[in-house]
C-alpha cells in the first residue's frame, strides 16, 4: 500500500487504485469468508462484505480508540480525521497509541481512513450507527492550590505529593481594580507629556517603563529584588505591565505619538473624566483590530520576525478574535489552567497562526535553529507563546483576567528539543503563567455581563483634609499610584504623606484642565470626614476665578497707522462681527473669521500685504 494525498468518493476506488494484493488480503481475512487470490476478486469481495450490516461488523473490529477517532471524523470533522485535534481531546499518548495500532494491521482501520479522510460513500452510512463522541469540556477550578509541582518529565502540573518543601508557591494577582487605577495614573502621565516612546515603533523608552513601574498599583508581575530562592534575577525578565500600557493606549485609541511623546486623543481626554470600565471596553475592542503592534514580537528568543518586511508573519488582527472567541467558553470567576485552555483551543478548532513560513523564524541560528523543522515550530512553541503573551502582558495588564503564576525559569521545557536552546532559562518571559480567571471587569468587557461590579472590597478612605489646607494620607496602602499622582498635580508635597493646597496650586491645576469641581469630588470620595469650610471656600473662589476667562482660539493682530480707519473698520456693518479694536492703532481678527475679514476689507478698498498667503498656506 503506497501513500497518496488523493481524495476518493468511494471505497472501491481506493481499494482498486491504492491497495496492492498484499494489502488487500489481510482485510479480506478479517471481513470475508473466502479470500480470493486476484486483486479484482479481492476488491469485489471486500466491497460485498461491507455492504449492508457488514459495515457494522467492520466497525466492531476496530480498537476502542480507533472507534473514537472514527466517531470524531464522522460526526465532528465532516469526514476528515484531524490528528492534532484528536490528540488535543484524547491526549498525545492516545494519538501515539492510535499510530501504533495502525501499524499492527490487525483491524480494518485503513478501510475507513485514507489520506486523513473517509471515502464519501461510507460517511453517510457510518453516521447512521457510529455513536456520537462526547463533547469536549474545558476543565475549570473553583479554588487554586497554594503550591504546585511541575513534573520534570512531562512538564505538567502535579497535584499529588506536593509539600511545602518541594512545591512552588503561586503568586496570585487580582487585577481589575488595580488596572483601573493604573489606567487613570498613566492617562495623567500622558496628559502631562511624561510618556516617551520610540517615534517609529511606539514602544516605551527605558526611562518611561521605569517611571510607569514606579506608580503601578501592586507593581509589575516580577519586581526585581523580590525573587524567590534559586530563581533568576527578575531584572533580566524586564518590564511587562510597564511595557504594555503605552502600547495599549495607542492601539486602543486613547493616545497617539507626537514625535517621541504620547498625547491624549479626544477619547483619551474623555476617559480621564468618564467611566473607566467603559473606556477599557472601548480600548479592548480597538485593540482586537489593531495592526500597529504584534504581541509575538515580545517573544525575543524567537528571531527572524522582522525579515523581508514581516511578509511571512500573519497579522495579529486575525489571531485575537480567535482567542477572544475561545474565551467565551471560560466561565467568569473560575480558574483555568493555561495548558488546559491551550489544549481546549486545539480540540475545538480555535486555531490561529503566527507565521506563513516557519522556516524564516529561528532560535539562536537561522540554519540549525529554524522552526521549520518537524516539531520545532509546534503549536506550544509558536502559537502557545503568543497566547501566553496575549493573556499575561495585555489582558491581565488591562485588568480583564486575574492571574496565578510562577517565575518563568524552567517551568515550560517544551522547547528543549530545539537546536540552540541550551543556554535559555525560558523561551519567553511569560512562561510562568499557570492559571487565569475572567474577573468582573473582564466579564463586562467581553460582553458576558451588562455592568461592571468589582468583587474586591472597597478601599477605606485614606485621606484627611485639614482646615489649614493640608491633605494627610492616613493610610498610604489605600492610595493608588493614580491617587498619589493626582495629589501631586493639585498640591505641593510638604512631607512624606502630606500635601498642601493653595490658590497657586489650584490655579496651576486648572491651567492643565483639573478643575475645582473635580478636585472636590476626588477629596470627598477619599476622605471619611466632611470637607473643612476653609477648603470648600478656597475651591469655590478658585472655581469663580477660573470661570472668568475662556479660550476662544488664536487671532491675528493687525497694526493700523490711521486711528480713524481703526474705528471705521471696527464699526463697519460687514466687518464689525469679524474683528475687534485693540486700542486706537490695532485690530484683532477673530479666530476662524480671517478669510471673511480679508474679503470684506478688500471690498472696503484696503488690504494687508502678504497676510492672505500666510493664512492660506
Predicted regions and their residues:
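Extended alpha-helical interface modules used as scaffolds for assembling large macromolecular complexes
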Residues: 174-190, 283-617
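Short, amphipathic alpha-helical interface elements at domain boundaries
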Residues: 1-379, 460-480, 485-489, 494, ...
Amino acid at each position: 500500500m503506497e501513500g497518496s494525498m488523493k481524495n476518493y468518493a468511494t471505497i472501491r476506488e481506493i481499494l482498486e487504485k491504492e491497495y496492492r494484493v498484499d494489502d488487500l488480503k489481510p482485510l479480506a481475512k478479517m471481513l470475508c469468508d473466502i479470500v480470493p487470490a486476484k486483486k479484482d476478486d479481492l476488491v469485489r469481495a471486500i466491497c460485498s462484505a461491507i455492504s449492508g450490516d457488514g459495515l457494522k461488523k467492520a466497525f466492531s473490529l476496530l480498537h476502542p480508540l480507533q472507534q473514537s477517532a472514527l466517531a470524531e471524523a464522522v460526526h465532528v470533522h465532516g469526514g476528515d480525521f484531524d490528528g492534532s485535534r484528536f490528540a488535543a481531546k484524547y491526549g498525545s499518548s492516545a494519538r501515539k497509541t492510535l499510530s501504533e495500532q495502525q501499524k499492527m494491521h490487525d483491524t480494518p482501520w485503513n478501510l475507513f481512513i485514507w489520506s486523513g479522510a473517509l471515502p464519501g460513500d461510507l460517511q453517510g452510512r457510518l453516521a447512521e450507527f457510529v455513536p456520537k463522541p462526547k463533547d469536549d469540556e474545558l476543565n475549570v477550578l473553583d479554588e487554586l492550590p497554594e503550591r504546585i509541582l511541575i513534573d520534570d518529565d512531562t512538564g505538567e502540573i502535579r497535584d499529588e505529593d506536593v509539600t511545602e518543601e518541594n512545591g512552588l508557591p503561586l503568586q496570585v494577582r487580582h487585577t481589575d481594580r488595580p488596572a483601573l487605577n493604573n489606567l487613570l495614573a498613566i492617562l495623567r502621565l500622558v496628559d502631562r507629556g511624561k510618556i516617551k516612546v520610540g517615534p517609529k515603533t511606539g514602544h516605551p523608552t527605558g526611562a518611561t517603563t521605569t517611571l510607569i513601574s514606579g506608580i503601578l498599583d501592586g507593581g509589575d508581575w516580577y519586581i526585581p529584588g523580590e525573587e524567590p530562592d534559586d530563581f533568576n534575577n527578575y531584572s533580566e525578565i524586564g518590564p511587562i505591565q510597564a511595557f504594555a500600557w503605552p502600547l495599549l493606549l495607542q492601539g486602543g485609541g486613547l493616545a497617539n505619538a507626537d514625535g517621541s511623546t504620547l498625547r491624549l486623543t479626544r477619547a483619551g481626554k474623555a476617559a480621564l473624566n468618564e467611566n473607566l470600565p467603559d473606556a477599557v471596553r472601548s480600548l479592548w475592542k480597538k485593540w482586537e483590530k489593531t495592526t500597529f503592534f504584534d504581541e509575538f514580537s515580545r517573544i525575543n528568543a524567537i528571531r527572524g520576525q522582522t525579515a523581508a518586511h514581516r511578509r511571512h508573519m500573519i497579522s495579529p488582527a486575525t489571531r485575537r478574535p480567535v482567542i477572544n472567541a475561545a474565551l467565551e467558553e471560560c466561565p467568569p470567576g473560575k480558574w483555568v489552567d493555561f495548558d488546559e485552555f491551550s489544549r481546549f483551543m486545539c480540540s475545538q478548532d480555535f486555531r490561529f497562526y503566527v507565521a506563513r513560513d516557519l522556516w524564516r523564524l529561528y532560535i539562536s541560528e537561522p540554519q540549525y535553529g529554524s522552526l521549520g523543522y518537524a516539531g520545532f515550530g509546534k503549536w506550544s512553541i509558536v502559537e502557545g507563546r503568543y497566547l501566553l503573551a496575549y493573556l499575561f502582558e495585555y489582558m491581565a495588564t488591562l485588568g480583564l483576567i486575574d492571574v496565578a503564576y510562577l517565575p518563568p525559569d524552567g517551568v515550560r521545557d517544551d522547547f528543549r528539543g530545539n537546536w540552540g536552546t541550551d543556554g535559555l532559562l525560558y523561551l519567553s518571559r511569560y512562561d510562568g503563567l499557570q492559571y487565569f480567571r475572567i474577573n468582573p471587569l473582564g466579564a463586562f468587557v467581553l460582553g458576558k455581563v451588562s455592568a461592571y461590579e468589582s468583587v474586591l472590597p472597597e478601599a477605606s478612605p485614606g485621606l484627611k483634609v485639614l482646615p489649614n489646607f493640608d491633605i494627610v494620607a492616613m493610610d498610604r496602602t489605600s492610595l493608588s499610584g493614580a491617587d498619589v499622582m493626582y495629589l501631586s498635580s493639585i498640591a505641593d508635597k510638604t512631607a512624606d504623606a502630606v500635601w498642601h493646597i493653595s490658590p497657586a496650586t489650584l490655579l496651576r491645576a486648572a491651567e492643565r484642565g483639573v478643575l475645582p469641581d473635580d478636585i472636590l469630588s476626588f477629596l470627598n470620595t477619599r476622605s471619611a470626614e466632611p470637607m473643612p469650610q476653609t477648603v470648600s471656600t478656597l475651591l469655590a473662589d478658585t472655581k469663580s476665578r477660573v470661570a472668568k476667562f475662556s479660550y476662544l482660539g488664536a487671532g491675528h493682530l493687525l497694526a493700523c497707522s490711521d486711528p480713524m480707519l481703526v474705528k471705521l473698520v471696527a464699526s463697519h456693518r460687514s466687518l464689525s462681527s469679524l474683528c475687534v479694536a485693540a486700542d486706537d492703532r490695532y485690530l484683532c481678527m477673530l479666530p476662524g473669521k480671517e478669510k471673511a475679514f480679508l474679503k470684506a476689507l478688500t471690498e472696503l478698498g484696503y488690504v494687508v500685504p502678504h497676510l492672505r498667503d500666510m493664512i492660506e498656506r
